[in-house]
Amino acid sequence: MSTGLQKGSRLMENRSPPSSFSIEHILGLDKKMDVASSPIIKHHRPWIECSSKVDGTFRQIPLIYDLPVQVDAMRRSAEEETKIRLDRGEEERLTYKREQSWYRGRRPRTAFTRGQIEILENVFRVNSYPGIDVREELASKLALDEDRIQIWFQNRRAKLKRSHRESQFLIVKDSLSSKIEE
C-alpha cells in the first residue's frame, strides 16, 4: 500500500464523531428510527387536501405536503398513505366545493327571504346610507347579522349606480341615433 493511502486510511480511523452541525445530524440521518413510529409534520393547507367521491365512498386525494421529521419516513408506500387517509373520521372531511370556497376567502352566501328583501328595500328608499343603529335594529328584526345588512346596502347602492349609468347610456344612445337619422 502506498504511503498516501496509508495516511488516508489512518485519518479515516481517527475521525471524530459527526458534529451537531453536520448534514446527517440536521436531517436526522445519524439516528436510526422506525419508519412506522416516525412523527409527521402536517402543515395546515386545506386548499390542497380535497375529497373526491368514488364508488359511493369518500376517498382523499394523496397529499404532497406531509413532511416526515426523519428522511427515512419518506419511504412509506402509497398503500399506507391511502389507508391513513381513509381511516380519518368523516367529520374531518369537507366537500371539494366548500374547501375551494374557503380557499378563495369566501363565506357561504346569505339567502334573503322575500319579506327580508321587502323590508330592506323600503328602508333603502328612505335612506340608502343607514347608520349602525338602524342596521343593528334591522338585524334584530330580520334575524340577520349586522354585517350582512351592511353588505346588502353596499350591494344595493352599487346596483342603483349601475342602473343609473345604464339608463344614462341609453338616453345618450337614443339621442345620438335620432340625430344620425335626421
Curated annotation (Swiss-Prot):
Annotated region of DNA binding: 103-163
DNA-binding as UniProt keyword: yes
Induction comment: By Ammonium chloride.
Record keywords, A-Z: Developmental protein, DNA-binding, Homeobox, Nucleus
Membrane-traversing stretches: none
Subcellular location: Nucleus
GO cellular component, as recorded: nucleus
Keyword presence, Nucleus: yes
Function: Appears to be involved in the regional specification of the anterior head of Xenopus embryos.
Similarity comment: Belongs to the ANF homeobox family.
Name this protein carries in UniProt: Homeobox expressed in ES cells 1-A
Lineage: Eukaryota, Metazoa, Chordata, Craniata, Vertebrata
Gene giving rise to this polypeptide: hesx1-a
